[in-house]
Amino acid sequence: MRLLRWIFQRDNQTLTCQVDQQPGAGNYTLSLVPHSDAAAEIAETFNTAWSAFRRHATIATELRRSGWTLAAYTAD
């Protein structure tokens, strides 16, 4: 189940950073997916939602410092 999805943009590049809860497992996955190459997805797994959201916030901060802007977001 998707909990959070932010789409970042820099120049002509687009990147999704999202947090999903794994059904039945109680784990949370944070994924970074470049839209130009979905096969280059990076995923990290966390035991708590708090840890996944904290990591998402850290990545979002670093992306903004690197010139990325938030283009869209959803909280499903």
PLM regions and their residue ranges:
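Intrinsically disordered, low-complexity regulatory segments
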Residues: M1-R5, P34, T69-D76
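Short, charged/polar low-complexity linear motifs in solvent-exposed/disordered segments
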Residues: V33-H35, F46, I59-T61, A71-Y73
